[in-house]
């Protein structure tokens, strides 16, 4: 338990990824390149969807918001991580730590819910194609987006309240490259029981509800696709879901490994690698996953390139 005269620290010290001096600059260059690619690809996809009329559909509205959350939560984490490679004293203010954690939970919860909404969108498109234009109107899409951001805000508020209940009397050294809840639990001088319960219940509610919606949607999608006689029809139906399934597997697999465990099972060194994957690598991979075999995105990119550079591409104008 915390002592009665315990005061809140004004700063935390982030241990970073490694304390090996010889690795600081190489890692800085690697993650700077990854962050640059992340911003260019996600912001590029946002821009492409905004300007191309062919992509003004519910599926791409959701994808545009997914790119926004990827770019945003990578920006919440990566710049500070890059700074730790260059700074001798790797500090972050107490307020900065709280804000970083709040923003991180807000954006990752938004992504979690977006993946569920995107699964529902694919379910309606494949299982109820005739009703799709009436069900998934632009107004409905934006109401869904607004609702999921609001729910993500509430989840972030609960998590942050759990963090604010903690005291740090004996140590302010966070064994991580950003202010995540598990290393802060490790250095708390007060009981973490209530805070841990809040985080696990709130996090489980959103993660599991997202997974359940995704699973139910894909059960109905598979049952519908099996009934399609045409091989081309089956391929087209499944091809629209492949990218989403890859993104879901990467995101939810890592989140479940990271957070839906009791604190006593945490291994901070292992968690650093897992955290690195979903805070830095996944935001870079998502736009590539969704664009890799997507003919509509490729055609839109050709049209934008043709318009920007003033040349005519026969494929672009089709």
Swiss-Prot record:
GO terms for cellular component: plasma membrane. PROSITE patterns: G_PROTEIN_RECEP_F1_1, G_PROTEIN_RECEP_F1_2. It is found in: Cell membrane. Belongs to the G-protein coupled receptor 1 family. It is a multi-pass membrane protein. This is Olfactory receptor-like protein COR3. The gene is COR3. Odorant receptor.
